[in-house]
Design a protein with these regions (language model features):
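Interdomain "pre-motor" coupling segment immediately N-terminal to P-loop NTPase/helicase cores
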Residues: 14-59
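Pre-Walker A (pre-P-loop) alpha-helix and adjacent loop at the N terminus of AAA/AAA+ ATPase modules
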Residues: 66-103
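Short glycine-rich substrate-engagement loop in P-loop NTPases that contacts/grips substrate
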Residues: 74-85, 125-160, 172-176
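Walker A/P-loop nucleotide-binding motif
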Residues: 99-116
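P-loop NTPase Walker A phosphate-binding motif
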Residues: 115-128
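Loop/turn-to-beta-strand initiation segments
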Residues: 129-130, 159-162, 192-198
Length: 207
């Protein structure tokens, strides 16, 4: 059987290696665990590395697997939450070849916007995609520090392949800083084709 498969692959211009799965972690084959000598599951070292990577990028430890549809009332609200989960999971799976480059999560508190944004950032980080997750307040602090001679935070924020900004609109408005720096960040990321996700409690009119 294996010889037949190899023959078909070669005829198609492929090799047996193209047919075999390619794992990011050869130790656990991307399962997240290995088996000890007595058969117990042991957390793979790759999970600790991913945990450290997420922490360094400011990414909360959330995952789509933890999404609990029962947390939402049965009916339209739950259906909407599930639809948003599926859309964002597909966004993360297809990154960077996404249907839309950017996304904005709108709505009042309690709809899971921050959680879903965190799930996207975490999933991308697990794929070794450079990610930055910041709250709007943190972003504003970085802008203010740079404006008064501090480190250049804007350049790194512009370059990162995926930027997640949580709770836009909760930050204080600083004259000549908040709007001006945010506009520069958004315009430069759009110009360079970078992907961005934002969550906010503001309405479209307030934005």
């Amino acid at each position: 059987m294996e010889a037949e498969v190899t023959s078909v692959l070669l005829a198609a211009g492929l090799s047996p290696e193209d047919y075999r799965p390619h794992y990011r972690c050869p130790l656990c084959q991307d399962k997240g665990y290995t088996l000890s000598a007595d058969g117990r599951r042991v957390r793979c070292v790759c999970q600790a590395v991913q945990h450290a990577d997420r922490k360094n990028a400011g990414v909360p430890l959330c995952s789509f697997a933890e999404f609990d549809a029962m947390a939402f009332p049965a009916g339209p609200q739950r259906e909407t939450a599930l639809r948003h989960r599926d859309l964002l999971r597909r966004y993360a799976d297809r990154f960077p070849e996404t249907d839309k480059q950017n996304f904005l999560l709108l709505g009042p508190t309690g709809l899971g916007k921050s959680f879903l944004l965190s799930c996207v950032a975490s999933a991308l980080r697990d794929k070794r995609t450079p990610v930055r997750f910041v709250t709007a307040y943190q972003l504003n602090c970085d802008f203010r520090a740079q404006h008064f001679g501090g480190p250049d935070a804007l350049s790194a924020l512009i370059r990162v392949p995926f930027l997640a900004v949580d709770d836009l609109g909760t930050e204080p408005m600083l004259r000549n800083i908040t709007i001006e720096y945010l506009n520069t960040l958004v315009e430069e990321r759009l110009r360079r084709g970078r992907h961005t996700g934002v969550s906010t409690n503001l309405t479209p009119g307030q934005l």
